[in-house]
Amino acid sequence: MEELQRYFEIDRFRQQYFIYPFLFQEYIYALAHYYALNGSIFYETMENFGYDNKSSSLIVKRLITRMHRQNRLIISINDSNQNRFIGHSKNLYTQTLSEGFAVIMEIPFSLQLVFSLEEKEITKSHNLRSIHSIFPFFEDKLSHLNHVSHILIPYPAHLEILVQILHSWIQDAPSLHLLRFFLHDYQNSNSLKARKKSISVCSKENRRFFLFIYNFHVYECESVFVFLRKQSFHLRSTSFGTVLERTHFYGKIEHLVVVLRNDFQKTLWFFKDPFMHYVRYQGNSLLASKGTHFHMKKWKSYLVYFWQSHFCLWSQPDRIHINQLYNHSFYFLGFLSNVRQNSSAVRSQMLENSFLIDTSIKKFETLIPTIPLIGSLAKAKFCNVSGHPISKPARADSSDSDIISRFGRIYRNLSHYYSGSSKKQTLYRIKYILRLSCARTLARKHKSTVRAFLKELGSPFLEEFLMEEEQVLSLIFPRTPSPSYRSHRERIWYLDIICINILTNHV
């Protein structure tokens, strides 16, 4: 247990005791408003100032003051949100305080992030996103594994758990009391729904505050995977049993530790270099392994006990689903993914004897969820629930070029997002729906038929729906007879799809 405890403490920054006084400085709220308008990240701005790794309250104050002077933010009378500042609203005061509180709390974490990146000699860290590691995992690793566990990030049984987790990092009692006030205030006003929804799905006006709390909560939940990954890296040829026996799952409840010690004495041999693979996006996680189903059940019990004993998180066993990859499909990042076994027969001949050899190759597939995607188009009035295109009267007042541009942009975004799909037939159906819906909208505007309008408009209408990927591939692969044929077979992952990750909410 001492080794795991040292691990949890090794990367933690120096305890900050002077966070609360910053709440009485007006430039903090100007800075918070600036971040709300620009959506920037604190450590990206900090890199431009060139501060060293001596984090102290004086440096933090100078940093904020300098940023405030460079970004003179004056809320004018013509501000579109000026009506929010009329009167004395309790919600307004709470919102303003929480925004400033979130900015202040991000400072020490951002300082620690920048310094750790400098030690590892990682440059331009603001261009890196954790989502970029998911695509290589899908392509290179998943097809060689046997089982996958779909995990929902556990939620705290009580809001006080969030305060206690943060207390282990920052020992500033006034700030923790203020954090406790914010959480209970939003709970009473039904803005915080931590029972059934993610903490990040909260009031948009306080999104920065809840994103900070949620990201820190997820970071603590995932700390066990980082620890085990490091142990696996250093102990590839040794048994995991000694590690688990020594840590006792970092349990703080005495009877639980006794139960685990007695229960796992006979099964510690099972945790031999498990080759566990873990990826997460938003509130969904995947834990894949090459082990057996019994092996995955042991890991499921381990995670449930660990989260409940160490973090007091309400993690029910039914929030972790174990399935075999070769006969189960799962939703992730808006894709319907699975691993198929493609069988093929090869005829071999040796002297006068010939025989057939059956081979089976695992292939990872990412499919486009047709029914949910058509349901989203039907909800937006592009088609009916059966996928039959309909006109969109709301666009009839716009110009022809604007209507065509809007429909074409929607399709290009969809084709860009699902360019990593192994089968793109669904994209052609979506293209048909959007093209015909656009044509019917224009025909309705000009009081004409669809056939006559398409004949009059000609090729410019078709070019608007040409995928950008097809144009690029025609330059990269000039020998390919048809760029659309090439794009149909190629799987291309674009790393900027997080900009349109709202598509993941439709499945």
From Swiss-Prot:
Main subcellular localisation: plastid
Domain of life assignment: Eukaryota
Transmembrane segments: none
Any Gene Ontology CC annotation: chloroplast
InterPro entries: Domain_X, Maturase_MatK, Maturase_MatK_N
An example Gene Ontology biological process: mRNA processing
Keyword terms, alphabetized: Chloroplast, mRNA processing, Plastid, RNA-binding, tRNA processing
Pfam families for this protein: Intron_maturas2, MatK_N
UniProt key word Plastid: yes
Subcellular location field: Plastid, Chloroplast
GO molecular function: RNA binding
PANTHER family linked: MATURASE K
Function description: Usually encoded in the trnK tRNA gene intron. Probably assists in splicing its own and other chloroplast group II introns.
HAMAP family with a match to the protein in the record: MatK
Family listed: Belongs to the intron maturase 2 family. MatK subfamily.
Record protein name field: Maturase K
Name of the gene encoding the protein in the UniProt record: matK
